[in-house]
From Swiss-Prot:
Coiled-coil zones: none
Keywords per UniProt: Cell inner membrane, Cell membrane, Cytoplasm, Membrane
GO cellular component: cytoplasm; plasma membrane
Protein name listed in UniProt: High frequency lysogenization protein HflD homolog
Membrane topology: Peripheral membrane protein
Family matches, as Pfam families: DUF489
InterPro entries in UniProt: HflD, HflD-like_sf
Intracellular or extracellular location(s): Cytoplasm; Cell inner membrane
Gene3D superfamilies per record: HflD-like (1.10.3890.10)
Keyword Glycosyltransferase attributed: no
Recorded family membership: Belongs to the HflD family.
Length: 207
């Protein structure tokens, strides 16, 4: 995969989209079905030649691009701190995951099991697929620690379907974090290349 600014921004946008959808489900008990489908689909896409291909096209990540642009434009109090906390947490967990090959294998096997469910039901967002992906997250990423504490309405958080959707979205966020790292992303790049990342984000939003 090319370590290009475009690939890095698309991966970051996917990460922000996953975090934004987690917020939607946690606070409102629902999220945009097309945006959710895009994130779930990325977990089964391994043949694409670039990051955009993994998500179908960049337009499917518009929500994430908008959230990313907002975070890059604002500093301090202007930022969505809840969203930032999810993104930082996912980036941290991805780094821990990459140091544990047996855990990576567990994630891979879990996704393969969910993929069989997807093929059987011919629907990547079927509740059985969602349950399998959520269980994969719970059995692997959740064990790495520290767990990501999701804020929201208790009535929505205690609903088993919503809890599964949130875990699936967090797993898709880990996938995006892996892509960010593969495209040359790092903490230092986030800190010192904000202007370049923002320019590319705005360019993608303008298309």
């Amino acid at each position: 995969m090319d370590a290009s600014q475009r690939n890095r921004v698309i991966a970051l946008a996917a990460l922000f989209q996953a975090a934004s959808l987690v917020k939607d489900v946690a606070w409102h008990g629902r999220c945009d079905p097309d945006e959710f489908r895009t994130m779930v689909g990325s977990l089964f896409s391994f043949e694409a030649s670039d990051v955009e291909g993994i998500y179908g096209n960049v337009h499917r990540l518009r929500r994430g691009l908008q959230a990313l642009a907002s975070q890059l434009e604002n500093r301090g109090s202007g930022n969505d701190m809840e969203l930032t906390r999810y993104v930082i947490g996912l980036l941290f967990l991805e780094r821990k995951l990459m140091k544990q090959p047996h855990m990576i294998q567990g994630v891979r096997e879990g996704i393969q099991g969910a993929e069989r469910q997807r093929d059987y039901f011919d629907d990547p967002t079927h509740e059985s697929v969602n349950a399998a992906l959520a269980q994969t997250y719970q059995d692997t990423i959740s064990q790495l620690g520290p767990r990501i504490i999701v804020q929201g309405e208790q009535a929505h958080l205690s609903n088993s379907d919503n809890a599964a959707r949130i875990r699936t979205l967090l797993l898709s966020g880990i996938r995006a974090a892996v892509l960010w790292r593969q495209a040359g992303g790092s903490r230092w790049r986030l800190l010192f290349s904000r202007a370049g990342l923002l320019r590319e984000t705005r360019a993608l939003l303008a298309h």
